[in-house]
Amino acid sequence: MKLIYHPVFLEHDTGMHPENPKRLEAFEGLPATEVPDGTPWLGLVHTEKHIENVKAACAAHRHLDPDTVASPGSYEAAVRAVGATILASETDDFALVRPPGHHAYPGRSSGFCLFNNVAIAAQKLANEGKRVFLFDFDGHLGDGTSHIFEDTDQVLYCSIHQYPAFPGHGWVDEIGRGKGKGFTMNVPIPPESGDDIFMDAVQTCLQVLEQYQPDVVAVSAGFDAHLHDLLLQLRVTEGSFYKIGNLLRERSPNIFATLEGGYNVEVLPKCVHNFLAGINGKEMLYNENETTSFRAVWEEYELRVNSVMGNLRSWWKFS
């Protein structure tokens, strides 16, 4: 797995917003990859009205919602982010893109996200008859992605995220509906959770991955669960992202990823490169002292994860 990057992603001008070009500028010396224009695939997930609204907002340099900035360069960056994620899905690579995507709904932008990059790529794969395990370890629920796939069993959405936190849902009882019931898995971890809880949640998710037997694993790779990130109260270190990569490599030959959150520009490159090292079977590049969670946090987590497993036992086995 290698990084797919293009300087067009820096043209999404958000000023002093936490999601700003410095996030990718922190990755020094990256070669530019030719990435396709994602416009032909937007309609796999998004309404025509939404696509036109994003285009108009970018041209007018206005916000799409209170948290989501648009600038004249944002539309081109956003459609290329979609294209880069499609390319990553074809080559088993990591799309290092912005704007991110997992909060975007079919009909609206949300939470720094214009179009839902990973959902579009996953829907394209599903349309080709593939089963997709969509693993979202960003510290926020990918509520747009969850909504998009809540009524299908062809894409299993699994999220580990801080709760309570934005967007305010992603609780243990949100397991999908209709044909998709049992194919949405939320593992909401408490604030102050450390590496121990985070990796326990990962192992719980991987039990379902093994049973689902997907053709492809799609990863919403957000790194805002890190101890020193700006927007959450989780205490995960760089080593956990290496472990996730390693565990996924052992379970699937077909994995691609796209960047979601991660707002500390000093640690984001380390987290991403650790994840890549794990996926590629290389040695860990960066290692911090692992964090452990206080007993009260563990007790709250255990109540939650037991509820997660209880709600999904009709579909999946847990050890």
Question: What does each of the following model-derived ranges do?
Answer:
Residues 1-319:
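HDAC/HDAC-like amidohydrolase catalytic core signature
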